[in-house]
Amino acid sequence: MTLHTTVGADAAPPLTKAYSGEPALVAIGRDAIAVRAGTTFAGHRFKAETPVAIEGALIAGADYGVTVRGGVARAWRAAGIPDGADVLGGFHYAPGGNATGRAGGDDVPAINPCSLWDVNFRPACKDPRGMALVQDGSHRFWCDIYLTGKDCRINGTSRFGVTIADGNDCPADPATCEPFRRFDYAAAVATLAAHGKGLLSLSEFPLAAFGVTERSATKGDPKVTGLDAPRTSRFGIMQAAGNMLIWGHDGDPDTPRASMFGGSWLDGGDAGSRYAYVAYRWPENSCGDFGARGRSDHLQLGGRRDSDDGR
């Protein structure tokens, strides 16, 4: 269950921006980012939009941290959670671009502009890697770009190129560190809660998956997390529909009921962003096409923390 707490203004780290409602970083095309004009971090003020130097070639499916040292901003591949007094923020370099309409994305690697975060504007969970900001008007939340992986206890819940957690490849129970016997609703809730995340609600899933090619599915068991361009959403959520049925809930704030969203490869022309089993009657079921995807509240220091009905 995602925690719903308020962060005091006095907890703000040493970052100020011209506008608190957007990250300090901005994507420039597919392969470059910059620090926004008017940003002050670690005692340095960026008066103009300033390019970030990227160490080495960008790797598709990798997460990057951005540090500021001596007034110079640099991006580096983040093997772990980007942390430290000099870390300004980070981003994800996706294996394909976001949807621009309602026919999915493309297969050209790109920085996902929705994945940009900074220390004042980020997911509320501890690990911001592999997440994208989903927003509809004033409502904002962060969604895992990738389906939950079997080895999420080690790799985090959103990682490119890993075995998908499902009824045939169960993740470890956080309480015992032994694999679950079933990947049912309770197991999915527990798996994500251990990372400070929750499952998508009935109102959140169609927002996160909007932009996929509707009424379509991939041709077989995807097995690993990755790119399925026709079913990438406008926010860069990969394999967003028509790959795995994902566990979610109906949105009840007190007693949320298990639900399933998106459709799997078995659902063909029925799959899509509006595909849902609401208040699913068999939450103890576990199958090879039942997966999960994490979500987190939006944390905005100096502003607000957005939360919905995520459980």
What are these model-derived regions, one by one?
Residues 179-183, 190, 256-311:
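Disulfide-stabilized, aromatic/cysteine-rich ligand-recognition loop
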Residues 1-60:
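Glycine-rich, flexible loop motifs
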Residues 55-61, 231, 285-288:
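Extracellular/lumenal carbohydrate-interaction signature centered on repeated Trp-anchored short motifs
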